[in-house]
Amino acid sequence: MAGLVSGAPVWAAPATASAIAPPKGPLQEAVLAGGCFWCLEHDLETLPGVVEAVSGYSGGHLDNPTYGQVSTEQTGHQEAVLVRFDPKRISFPTLLRSYWRNVDPLDGGGQFCDRGDSYRPVIFTSSKVQQAQAEASLKAAAAELHRPTSAIRVQIKPLQRFWPGEGYHQHYAVRNSVKYNYYRWACGRDRRLDAIWGKRARSGAAWSGNAPQVAGSKPSSKPNQNPNQKPRKS
């Protein structure tokens, strides 16, 4: 898709980050928020068909936000991940299935041990098609969990602009694996995902139960620690 929404660029690099080139050729983009962007970036960038995942910020009113500013909960941004993907290998609805099963859709006050609006789950959509597919995926997720759609706390919002995060946040799970693995364990992310989704946690498998078929979902050809003691992403 084109990198424009209402005439404004979807992506915009802050002065402290390298510019991220817009997609070329057949690549498409998705911007998703699901709590700690270290985790969501790592969960999605390994999917077949995903070319790149970038940690950053979206949804707020401040240009060029820094991590410190977003952490104040005063800018309106969420930690988000920009995913570039090949639609011939993975469709947006298929990508969304993996997204849903990597978040707690019943929690709108943050995610796991991370609390606050900057950690709330959001699907940012850049077209009417993406919006329709996101809404269908919400209904499918609710059906799989045997919950009413009113219980789902993932927001679906129009994408205005994505700001790449600071360089030290990018690919954090790979570059700082010991710290990342401890943080993820201490936060209880995977334990909660397993409790919600069961065997389908973290997977992109087809929707189960009474979930409706989402159009375009088939791609072409130790105990938990006190959350207040979690490592800070400084």
What are these regions (language model features)?
Residues 2-234:
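Flexible coil/turn and secondary-structure edge motifs
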